């Protein structure tokens, strides 16, 4: 019965994603994302109050916030999935680390958008380390970089700002991401609509897989 419900939900999500595909084509020429449609976080959460975030979007804002990160957030919202994107999901007065940490713990799937300046960002690295340590399903998008480019910059490694254990956490998280099958995108030749569609499909696939595993674990525990 649970399997039937999950399949039904995936079918609904897929139909919504298909119906919204044309919206992604609009910004293909440039970096500015259409703001005609805004999503109210509270309406996505439902009348009963805030629900948990299902998808965490880890990204370097200066590289991808106004393109793939925002487009993917919109696409998931149209499919009825509640994604966490910092500038869309946080409100004045929120404590940054608490809000982000809570969203990471709640999510089922994360999308990590690796871009040229990603590894220069402390926030990106800390979020990635938390996602890996929380054993979340992570979908890498290699945006204008190759997996082999995921290395801790020497400036970060030599900095006295970070504790040795933090540097090890960052290195481990980057290694894990490097060896995870992801989506590669070249902004000079790629199709943004295809990228967002592939990322949304990957989110649905991984959510179904994680929910199946959780359901099996619950069944096993109930028999003990």
Swiss-Prot record:
GO biological process, one term: signal transduction
Domain of life: Eukaryota
Record EC number: 3.2.2.-, 3.2.2.6
Keyword entries, A-Z: Hydrolase, NAD, Plant defense
InterPro entries per record: TIR_dom, Toll_tir_struct_dom_sf
Annotated site residues (Important for ADPR cyclization) in this chain: 123
Binding site for NAD(+): 60-65, 93
List of catalytic residues: 127
MF-aspect GO terms: NAD+ nucleosidase activity; NAD+ nucleosidase activity, cyclic ADP-ribose generating; NADP+ nucleosidase activity
EC class: hydrolase
Catalytic activity from the UniProt record: NAD(+) + H2O = ADP-D-ribose + nicotinamide + H(+); NADP(+) + H2O = ADP-D-ribose 2'-phosphate + nicotinamide + H(+); NAD(+) = 2'cADPR + nicotinamide + H(+)
UniProt key word Cytoplasm: no
Pfam families linked to this entry: TIR_2
Domain TIR, first and last residues per copy: 51-178
Description of how the protein assembles with itself and partners: Homodimer.
Domain notes: The TIR domain catalyzes the NAD(+) cleavage (NADase) activity. In contrast to classical TIR-NB-LRR receptor-like proteins, only contains a TIR domain.
Function noted in UniProt: An NAD(+) hydrolase (NADase). Upon activation catalyzes cleavage of NAD(+) into ADP-D-ribose (ADPR) and nicotinamide; NAD(+) cleavage triggers a defense system that promotes cell death. In addition to ADPR, also generates a cyclization variant of cyclic ADPR termed v-cADPR (2'cADPR). Also hydrolyzes NADP(+), but not other NAD(+)-related molecules. v-cADPR activates ThsA, an NAD(+) hydrolase in B.cereus (AC J8G6Z1). Probably makes 2'cADPR; the cADPR made by this protein is bound by cmTad1 (AC P0DW61) and activates ThsA from B.cereus.
Protein name (record): Probable 2' cyclic ADP-D-ribose synthase BdTIR
Organism: Brachypodium distachyon (Purple false brome)
